[in-house]
């Protein structure tokens, strides 16, 4: 049963006419017994047999046997009238396990959205078309949102989640579609499908919300920003809407609903510095369903509707960076000034009193004779061996020069000339030598004298023992002394 285009039987005929001629080819037709047009018969062109097939599915439970009457004639009518040949065909229907059938195949149920979990919705069952009693079990094949549950024995459908009519992902035109299965315990088991269509009725479960939720406004002569109000619910749970500012947002902002009640104008009523602020806007619909929405408002330093915001990074971060850069630059300038000033003020390499060039020495002579000053005789004999103290300087880069080798003072007086020339060359390359271009060498008078010859004057206890005539040879600067002492005896 339930098989379409199934070959039931082949009918064979005998014809003495020439094979494959029109007088030989047979034509078959069913003349009785097929009230439901379940069968059809055609001719095999090769064997000239009649092929009986089903063109509809046979139902064992409706009819177990079909008796058909088949007639056969030639394509070419007989020349003389002859009786036609007929055959009786009995078709027995074989019973097979048929799937359960839901009644009706598609079931429409109206139910209110938002019902509680576990609340019953409907019972959706199927019948078994077979004559034998078989047990049928039920389960859900496709439930996109997972909102339903089905009892496997009774087929009772209950709510397993919150049914939301406004869920556009799963609900189309207020209808939520679910597919269920019914399976029997036959051999082999068969399954039937059914469709459950839930028409969700609206309740006031959504509050109104404004769009957009981000605005930009000037803090000088601000232009009100219009926000459209939307509500997913159906009338009468929609407009007119009401607006109210909460969380102290009404201190700086105002919210007014238009005449139609489907939009709200948000405006700044007090000056605010540039920045981002949260405005708490509460909207309620005609059914007093309230919804709080936080509007993100960007306030700019501008006028009217010329909304332009400078990048806050420029002033919030650039100014401190510039200040730090200027402070660093000022510090560098101060350090540079101190370094240059330190370079200009240098300590003299020799104290002024140490410079004995072109100076007249006063020996404190008061008439009775000169008082010898205390000199370090050992320094006069050391000559070039008396090396000056090294002066540290920070205005020039250090250079590495090998220390010159000075020749020791010879014992032979005849070698004193070579001694001076060689040590002069060494002193010219000595970085520790005094910064003078001449070598100071005192006249050496021999080792027998305890005092070097500082002058030709000899010590005496009286002015009469001294001769001052040599002062006339010293020039005009000593003329007065020459007059005072040179001619004193004649007076």
Swiss-Prot record:
The gene is CDH3. Interacts with CDCP1 and CTNNB1. Glycans are attached at residue 228. InterPro entries: Cadherin (IPR039808), Cadherin-like_dom (IPR002126), Cadherin-like_sf (IPR015919), Cadherin_CS (IPR020894), Cadherin_Y-type_LIR (IPR000233), Catenin-bd_sf (IPR027397). Disulfide bonds: none annotated. Its main location: membrane. The keyword Ribonucleoprotein does not apply. GO terms for cellular component: adherens junction; catenin complex; cytoplasm. This is Cadherin-3. Residues 1-316 are extracellular. GO terms for biological process: adherens junction organization; calcium-dependent cell-cell adhesion via plasma membrane cell adhesion molecules; cell migration; cell morphogenesis; cell-cell adhesion mediated by cadherin; cell-cell junction assembly; homophilic cell adhesion via plasma membrane adhesion molecules. It is found in: Cell membrane. Three calcium ions are usually bound at the interface of each cadherin domain and rigidify the connections, imparting a strong curvature to the full-length ectodomain. SMART domains: CA (SM00112). Keywords: Calcium, Cell adhesion, Cell membrane, Glycoprotein, Membrane, Metal-binding, Repeat, Transmembrane, Transmembrane helix. Residues 340-491 are cytoplasmic. The lineage of its organism: Eukaryota, Metazoa, Chordata, Craniata, Vertebrata. Cadherins are calcium-dependent cell adhesion proteins. They preferentially interact with themselves in a homophilic manner in connecting cells; cadherins may thus contribute to the sorting of heterogeneous cell types. One of its GO terms (molecular function) is calcium ion binding. It is a single-pass type I membrane protein. The chain crosses the membrane at residues 317-339. The keyword Isomerase does not apply. Residues 1-102, 103-208, 209-314 form the Cadherin domain.
